[in-house]
Structures are given as structure tokens and as C-alpha cells.
Amino acid sequence: MSWRLSFRTNLLIYNVRRRNYATKAAGKPATRPNRWKSVIGLEVHAQIQTNSKLFSGAEVAFSSPINSCVSLFDASIPGTLPVLNRKCVELGVRTALALGCKVNSVSMFDRKHYFYADLPAGYQITQQRAPLARGGLLSFPVFVPGVSRKPYYKSARLHQLQLEQDSGKSLHDPVERKSLVDLNRAGVPLMELVFEPDLETGEEAAALVKELILILTRLGSCSCRMEEGALRVDANISVHKENTPLGTRTEVKNIGSVRAVAQAIEFEIERQIGILDGGGKIFNETRAWDAAGRQTIAMRDKEVVQDYRFMPEPNLPPLHVNVDGECDADVVVDAVHIGSSLPELPEETRRQIVEIHNLTPEMAIILVNDITLYNHFRTILDEPGKARSPKAVANFLINELLTILNKNKIDIEECRIPSTHLAEVTDMLEGNIINAYLARLIVQEALDGEGRESPALLAQRNDWLMITDTERIEAMCKDAIKNNPKVVEKYRKGKEKMLYALAGEIAKVSEQKVDMAKSVDLLKNMLK
């Protein structure tokens, strides 16, 4: 591909992206057609990371054989009673404090009645009247690399955080016309986090979920493995025009990934706008996200409000939590002690990266959003006896390593290249031994070899070393000037961009190994 074609192609791509994402790039929510506004509230069910269930001693293990982790209480055998798991309460309090909630000194458990085959008791034990905590605020950055030009911050109020038990799983066999029930999940401890409808776009919702995942994993209160169902998201969505009452909302249930949160919400917003613009009516219904078809599909309507017949759970006493002063921590869960041992949260880490290491907010967001990437950054930067540039390390990890991993469709968690080898590539870049193009070749070769050989050996063996010899580069510059007289003429007439066309020819001849900065300087001197 010639440099002209490449330039025109990149310009076309830029203009298309600019039209599609102009409002997001400006750091603001997208503007809807005909002044439609969307209102989004999330409910997040996070599985509490404990070894046993909320009210029984049965093991919690995702990959266990069917119905192998079921106690008598989980199966609702008459005469069995619930015993509250203290660890679940402690992790719930820990999460509430990290999110700025007010932990209630006394909370209550309730029965929520409904019938499903995988709910053998006919009710779920939850917290309706007096939850573990209320209030709270989650602030988070909204930024999509490659789409957003600039991040912006959004906040969502947390209405309440409550403890509850999960239901079992129904497995439907259409061939045999049977429904099979697995009770391994029945009684697994959950935190339900109910957010106020403060969001406007799918990207904001996805950013909230991403930030919540970062917080919960740092707290150790949830594994957040969405592929295992450890974190599930329900979205309540409505649209209305400015200065009009809120529209009828629909609920999209059990969204199973961060990207799916954005996609499902954006689809549902556009679906509702399309119906209303066509003179139709939105029904209060529950919908599901069909990832394969990339659409929401109707599950059941909610026009008739279901009566869950909430009532106090008679077999559990009020839950007392110490929220001020001293107490016997062996008897009562102590929120004061738990609050004093909270870890550094993602926003504090981002602040330090910007203020201490002088990186951009965009870089800080990308690094902190992936714990493996951030660990590589810290390991390389903190190596004893080395004084590396934080900006150089971050640039390599974000612009070179992630580019190659994305090209190979490999998650960074699966990357077998050790931090020591990544540090070596960074040093070679900083020492002008290789350039960015050669760094990518080395990373690709290291990936193919599962990181067994050092980058220095790979560079030597494949002759992937930058050409820095002045005489060699001068000879290449002379050839480029000689072979491209029309480009030279345009440059001398004032078209300065033509200089980079000549530099591109030199890069091509050298197989991208030449020191580009040096070649540009030499060309300038030769063409004076």
C-alpha cells in the first residue's frame, strides 16, 4: 500500500469515527434523536466469595458435579433451620463501607415468596425492609480506548445493599421434555446492589460495572467471574423526551458480560425510541439479552404487579453490626474495625499514577482497569536497581503489548511472557536498540515461543536491531532523494509533509529497522 493510499484510508476511517462518536469523544453522553433522553438504573447481584453458603455449611464450588453441594437446608427438608454465615456479613459490610454506604446497626431478614422449580422452599430469604446498608455513591470514569478522545466522570447513587440467598438452576431438555434441577447454587450468598437511575447511556452502565468489579475484586468480596455467574447485572431502562414524565421502563435480566451491558442497553434504548417514534406503546416487561442475535427478547410482562408476600423471616434474629465505639469483635461484626482495614481503591491508584508518575488520565484508566496489566507495570517499574521511566513502561505495555495481544485475540491473563522479559523490551526501546515496530515483532515471537527465550536473544537471532549507523542511513537518504524526484520537488515548494513520504520509503527499504528520527533529520539537512 502506497503512503498516499494509506493516508487517505486513515483519513476516511478518522472521519467516519468522528461522525459516529463525536458526542462521546467530547466527553459527554450521546445525544439521542428528537431530543429523547434515556434513564438507566442497574441492579447487580454479586456472589460473595466464601467457602460455604449463606445459611448452611454446604460448599460453594462452581465446577462441582450436579447436586453435590447441597445440604438438607438447601433442599428445604422440613425441620432444618438457617444459620447465618458470619463471613458473608463481614464482606457485605466491607463492600458497603468501600462504596460510602451507611451500614445499619440493625438489619432484618425477610421471606420473598414466589414459585420456581429451583426454589424448593417456595421463598427466598432476602432483606427487604431493613437491608444491611443504605445510601452510598460510586464515581467512575467513562472511557472507551480507540473511541473516546477524553474520559469523563459519572456518579451513580447506591440505594441499598442487601444480603440474600441465590436460587438453584433449572436445566431444560427439549428433546426429553424434562426440566432438571441442580441445587448446587441454591443458598449461595449474594449481595444485591441497587443503584438509582442516574445513568444515561450503555457505555456509562458498562463503566459502572467495570469499576464495581475492580472494587469488589480488591476487597476480596466477590470473584466477579461473570462467565461463572458470580456477577450478574439487571438493567432497568426507559426513555422520555425532555420536560416530560419518565417513560415506561423495561428490565433486561441477567446480562453476562461488561460489553454485553453496553450492547443490551443501547439496543433496548433504540428499540424503545423506534416504537415510540412509530406511535407505539412501551410495555412494562422483563426481557433477556440474546448475545448471538444482538437483541433483547421478551421473557414475561410485569403489567400485573406480582405480590411476593414479603414477611419477616421467623427463624433468623435481627442482625446487629457495631457501627461506632468499641465492641467484642468475637460476638458482633465490627464495622469500625473492618473500615480501618480497607485496601487502596481503584480511584486512589489512578490518582497516584497521574500525580506521582506523571501519566495521562487515559493511561491511568487503561492500566488500572486490568489488574494483570497493572501488576506488570508495577513489577517493571519497581525492579531493584533499575530507574525506568514510568511513561516509557506504560507506553510499551499499552501501545505495543496490548496491540499484539489484541491482534492474536489473547487476554493479558493468558500471556506467558514474564514481566522480566517485558522489562527487557522496554529497556531495549529506551536504549534505542529497537524501535516500536521491532518491539512488536519480538513480542509476537515471544508469544509464539511462550516466553521461553529472552528478548535480547530473539532480536539477535532474527536481526531485529535498529539501524542507527549514520553512514548507512545517509546512503539510504541519498537513494530515497534520487528515486523520488517529484516528492522532493513538492517538498522544496513548501509541502513539508512530503519529507515523511521520503522517510516512509527509507523505512520500507530498511524493513522498518531504520532510526526514523535520525533519517528525518538527515533528510532535512540534505534538502536545504
Curated annotation (Swiss-Prot):
First and last residues of the transit peptide: 1-21
GO cellular component: glutamyl-tRNA(Gln) amidotransferase complex; mitochondrion
Assembly mode: Subunit of the heterotrimeric GatCAB amidotransferase (AdT) complex, composed of A, B and C subunits.
Protein's name in the database: Glutamyl-tRNA(Gln) amidotransferase subunit B, mitochondrial
GO biological process terms on file: glutaminyl-tRNAGln biosynthesis via transamidation; mitochondrial translation
EC number(s) stated in the UniProt entry for this protein: 6.3.5.-
UniProt entry keywords in alphabetical sequence: ATP-binding, Ligase, Mitochondrion, Nucleotide-binding, Protein biosynthesis, Transit peptide
Localization: Mitochondrion
Family according to the record: Belongs to the GatB/GatE family. GatB subfamily.
Superkingdom of this protein's organism: Eukaryota
